[in-house]
Amino acid sequence: MPAFETVVIAYRAEEAHSRIAADRCESLLHKVGCRVLKGPTGPQDNPYPHFLEATGGHIDLAIVLGGDGSILAAARYLAAVDVPILAVNVGGHLGFLTQPPEVLGGRYWERLLAGEWELEKRMMLQASLTGPPPLPERQPYFCLNEFCLKPASEMRLTSIILELAIDGEIIDQIHGDGLLVSTPTGSTSYTVAANGPIIAPSLQAITITPICPLSLSSRPVVLPATGTIEVSPLRDPDLNIKLWSDGAFAAPVHPCQTVRIEVARHPTRLLILEEDHSYFRTLREKLKWAGTRIQAERDPECLLPPQNHP
C-alpha cells in the first residue's frame, strides 16, 4: 500500500515550470500506486472544490506548486479537512511558506514516500458577519495570513472609522485606511508592511494592526489566541467597506454589521521535508538580514578583535 493513497496536485496555471513539475510529480506518484488528481490554481482557477467533491474530502496529501499566494488559497480549503500540504516554491516570489524545488526529487522524494517528514501546524483565523441582513450565505471565512477590513472605492481614497472590541470590551475607535487582524504566519506579510511586529509562527497569538491611522496613539496590539475580536464600522457613507481574506475578497460589510474574528478550529498542516528547516533562516534569506556569525561562515577572521594601531 502506498504511503499516500490519494494525492492532489495544484500548480500555477500561468507558469510553465509549475505545470512541468506537476506532470513529473503525477508520474512518480502513479508509479507507486497513488491516486492523483491535478488542477491549475490562480486568479481564475480554483481546483479545490473539485478535489474535495471528487474525493469526499479524503485526501492524504496536497502538493502545491507555486508561491505563497498558492499556499494561502490551498489552506483556506484544505485545513478544515486536515490535509497536509507540501508547499514547493515553483515560480513564486518570496516563498515564506514554501520549500525549495529540490524537495521534489532525489533523497527528499524518498523521504516523502517513506514517511520521514515533519508536520508544522500553523494557526488560522475564522471570521463571521453578524447583524442585520444582508448577511453572507456561506460563513465562516478562513485565513492563514490575515483578515483585512478596508474601503474599496473606485472614485476616491477614503478613510473609515472602526470600533474595536476584544472579548466584549470596547477598546478603541480606529480612524484610518483600514485594519489588519493577523496570525503569526501573516506577521511577515501585509502586517509587517503596516509596521506591525514579526511573530514566530510557533506562538499562539493574534495581532491587530491599524493601516495608516490618523492618530499616533493607534498602535499594533498583540493578543493571546484565546480572545474574540469584534470590529464594527462606525462611518461608511459610501458603503465601501470590504472584508478580505489573505488578499482575496470575502464579503461586503454593511452598516450595523459586526465582523467577529477568532482562532479557527483546524490549523494548516505544512509537510516539511528539509532536515535543517529553520524559520529564522528563512527570515534572514527573505528579508536580507545579516550578522557577524553569518559572515564568519565565509570569513572567520571577522570575529577576531580589532587590533590597536599606533
Curated annotation (Swiss-Prot):
Cofactor(s) needed for function: a divalent metal cation
Pfam families in the record: NAD_kinase, NAD_kinase_C
Active site, renumbered: 68 (proton acceptor)
InterPro entries: ATP-NAD_kinase_N, ATP-NAD_kinase_PpnK-typ_C, NAD/diacylglycerol_kinase_sf, NADK
GO molecular function: ATP binding; metal ion binding; NAD binding; NAD+ kinase activity
GO biological process: NAD metabolic process; NADP biosynthetic process
Residues the entry annotates as binding NAD(+): 68-69, 145-146, 156, 175, 177
Cellular component per GO, a single term: cytoplasm
EC number from the UniProt entry: 2.7.1.23
KW Glycoprotein (keyword) present: no
Protein localization: Cytoplasm
Catalysed reactions, semicolon-separated: NAD(+) + ATP = ADP + NADP(+) + H(+)
Protein name: NAD kinase 1
Alphabetical UniProt keywords: ATP-binding, Cytoplasm, Kinase, NAD, NADP, Nucleotide-binding, Transferase
Major enzyme class: transferase
